[in-house]
């Protein structure tokens, strides 16, 4: 802003070496003030006219005016740098770089020195940390800018916790870590999305197969995804060959998810009617080719992970 604090005693030291002994100096903003010895300035003085201002020194000897002389106060402008800033770097994009800039006016004649030792107006970096750049004018005036580069990153999926097998409420919790800030989305096998949300927990998730997407919103570093399943059991099926609900099979198991699970079907008296695995199409409602009647049937599901579920369903004809 062209304003600076001057110690007028520094001028006195230089001038008194050229004057006879016993001379004292006082400073004034105007010649008239110096002439009338009014409004003397303090020795620690802030100039009131930006960049260039003339004040007056009155030299006295035994209370007699020895002379009045001009003193020129000059404030040389500092380099024009933008404010300190914080930038983000996506660690997953290494070794790509981001640009750090002193953000000075075009066509300037500054000299630059970065904390990295580089001497250009901008530099490319791919390491987080604190960087400084000092710009110096041809007059030797310097100013320093600090740029902090902080990390962001895509998420690492540590675990997907699924509380399933419940008729009323299956709960999915996504455990992820990383330097970013994340939103969570799950998409079912039909491509329908629950929508992105801040919470990593999803309630009332229907049985089936899903993909979880985790998006970094701190610096848009990217999206990671992973498949998972929610186990569930149909309450009924209608094996009438109309292409809908013709087979009874456990939801959320397949050749990819818990393929070594064992599924057993019993009649109401506990007789084993059939046994199959997730890789089969399921039970078609027949035993040895004979259609079973409309009734309730019981199942035991022994999942590959060791969990066991028992319940019943209805065969409708």
Regions found by a protein language model. Give the residues of each.
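Solvent-exposed segments in extracellular or luminal domains encompassing
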Residues: 38-54, 120-138, 199-209, 281-284
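Extracellular interdomain linker/stem segments of modular secreted and single-pass surface proteins
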Residues: 74-81, 150-158, 165, 207, ...
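Extracellular recognition modules
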Residues: 56-60, 132-136, 211-215, 298-302
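Short, exposed coil/turn segments at beta-strand boundaries within extracellular/luminal domains
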Residues: 62-68, 138-144, 152, 193-195, ...
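Short beta-strand segments within Ig-like beta-sandwich modules, predominantly Fibronectin type-III
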Residues: 113-119, 189-198, 274-279
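Short loop/turn motifs at secondary-structure boundaries
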Residues: 9, 158, 223-317
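Solvent-exposed loop segments of extracellular immunoglobulin-like
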Residues: 15-29, 104-113, 178-185, 190, ...
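A short beta-strand segment in extracellular, disulfide-stabilized domains
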Residues: 2-16, 94-106, 168-176, 246-252
């Amino acid at each position: 802003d062209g304003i600076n604090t001057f110690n007028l005693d520094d001028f006195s030291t230089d001038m008194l070496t050229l004057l006879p002994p016993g001379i004292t100096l006082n400073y004034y903003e105007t010649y008239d003030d110096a002439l009338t010895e009014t409004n003397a300035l303090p020795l620690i003085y802030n100039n009131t006219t930006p960049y260039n201002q003339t004040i007056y020194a009155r030299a006295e000897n035994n209370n007699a005016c020895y002379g009045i002389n001009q003193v020129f106060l000059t404030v040389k402008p500092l380099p024009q740098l933008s404010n300190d800033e914080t930038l983000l770097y996506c660690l997953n994009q290494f070794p790509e770089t981001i640009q750090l800039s002193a953000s000075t006016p075009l066509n300037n004649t500054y000299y630059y020195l970065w904390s990295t030792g580089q001497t250009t107006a901008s530099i490319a970096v791919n390491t987080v940390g604190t960087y400084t750049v000092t710009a110096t004018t041809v007059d030797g005036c310097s100013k320093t800018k600090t740029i902090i580069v902080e990390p962001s990153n895509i998420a690492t999926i540590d675990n997907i916790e699924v509380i399933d097998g419940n008729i009323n409420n299956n709960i999915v919790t996504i455990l992820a870590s990383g330097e970013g800030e994340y939103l969570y989305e799950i998409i079912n096998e039909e491509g329908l999305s629950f929508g992105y949300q801040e919470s990593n927990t999803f309630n009332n998730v229907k049985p089936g197969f899903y993909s979880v997407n985790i998006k970094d919103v701190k610096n848009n570093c990217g999206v990671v995804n992973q498949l998972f399943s929610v186990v569930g059991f149909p309450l009924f099926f209608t094996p009438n060959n109309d292409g809908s609900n013709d087979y009874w099979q456990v939801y959320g198991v397949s050749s990819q998810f818990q393929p070594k699970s064992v599924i057993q079907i019993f009649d109401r008296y506990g007789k084993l009617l059939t046994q199959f695995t997730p890789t089969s199409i399921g039970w078609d409602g027949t035993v040895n080719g004979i259609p079973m009647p409309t009734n309730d049937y019981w199942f035991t599901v022994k999942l590959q992970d060791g969990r066991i579920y028992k319940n019943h369903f209805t065969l409708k004809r």
